[in-house]
């Protein structure tokens, strides 16, 4: 650990993201799941009710900046694994899907508590505000690049 703060930029933010993601992916691998499956399952589990498949796919593609075809394939895999269920175009998590989401959440919650231990709440709050602003600006830039490419 260092007390000298590195300059904040894409590399520093990316290193933190990929370190955290690697932890999550290790936990997920123990349960035979992937990162994209977990994000898709999270969207279904935390929804107020069943989601239209298109809305679920849109939510996940928006979060991950991934292709819709990839997310449709992920939904298909979760359906085949019995972690999601379909009623027509409506998708909902199964009990097994909720259980996997809860188990992974509990495991990663313990790890996250260790990762964030000892960091003053005001520093975490400031970091959250900065990252929210960076995300907002990056999403605006991505939208502009997408418009320009059309």
State where each predicted segment sits:
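N-terminal leader segment of winged-helix/HTH proteins
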Residues: 1-38
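Alpha-helical linker/hinge and terminal dimerization helices associated
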Residues: 16, 20, 104-119, 134-145
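N-terminal helix-turn-helix DNA-binding core of bacterial DNA-binding proteins
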Residues: 23-70, 75
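Generic structural concept
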Residues: 44-45, 94, 128, 135
